Amino acid sequence: MADANSIADAWAQVHGEAKPEEGGVGQWIWEAIQGDFNENRTAGQITADMVISLIPIVDTICDIRDLCANIRTYRKDPDNKLTLFFIALTVVGFFPEIGSVIKGVVKIIFVYVRRYLKRAEDLLDATKLGRATNAALDAALPKIAQFLSESRVVKWATKEGVPDIFRFCAKHLDELAAKVDAGKLKAKFDEGVEAAQTLLGRIKYIVPGSTRDKLDDFLTFVGQQKNKIGDAIGQFTQPIRTILKLTAKRLDDHAWIAFTQTHNKGWIAPMSQQGA
C-alpha cells in the first residue's frame, strides 16, 4: 500500500484541496475514512464517488472507508444480520478480478440495495430479495449509465477496445457471481481488514493523542472480531450471487434495448422496469 503522503496527494488531487501540512496528514486521512461514508448520499454524490474510485490509491482508501464504516455499525449492533450482509457486500469490492469499472457498477447497485432491503429475513426469501433488488436496479440504472458515460470510463473502454460497455459489465458480473463463495468472502475480508490495519497503523503515530486513542480502540475491536465476522459473512453467498446475476441480466437487457432503440427511432426504451 502507498504511504500516507501518497494517499494525501491523490485525495487532494481529486478534491481540489491543498495537501495539509505534514503534521496534519494523518488526522486528515482519519477524518476522510470515518467522515466521508454516508448512507444517505445523493445520486450525484454516489456517481462522483465511483468516478473518484477509478483513481489508484483513492480506490483503496474508498474500500477501506466503506469497510470501516460497516464494522463501526456492526459494533453498535452485532446481532443485526443486515449489517453483516452489508459487510459482505463491501468485501466484494476487494475481489481483484473485477477491476475499477466493474467495481464502480457493483458499488452503485449495492448502495441502492441497502435502501430497499430492510429486513434480514428477506435475504432468505428469493421472491422478496428479487423484488428488492429489482426496485434497487430501477433506481440505480440511470446512475450506472451516468457512471459508464464518464470520461474516465469512456477513455478506458476505448483504450481496451470494449465495444459495448453494458454487455462488458454484464458478462463480468456473471463471472463475478460464480466466484463468490464463503471461503473467498472470508479471505477477502481478512485482506481488507489487513489493509485497514496497515493504513490506520501508519497514521496513528502522526495524529493527536485523542484521535490516536479512538484509532487504537477501533483497531483493537477489529482485531478481536476479525475471525468472527469473517466466518459469519459466508452465509450470504447466495444472496450476493442473486443480486449480481440480476444486475448482469438488467445490464444485458439494457444493452439490447439500446441497440433496438438505435435501429428503431420510433421507440424510446425505458431505463427501468417501470419505464422511468
Indicate residue ranges for each PLM-predicted region.
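Long, low-complexity, intrinsically disordered regions
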Residues: 1-276
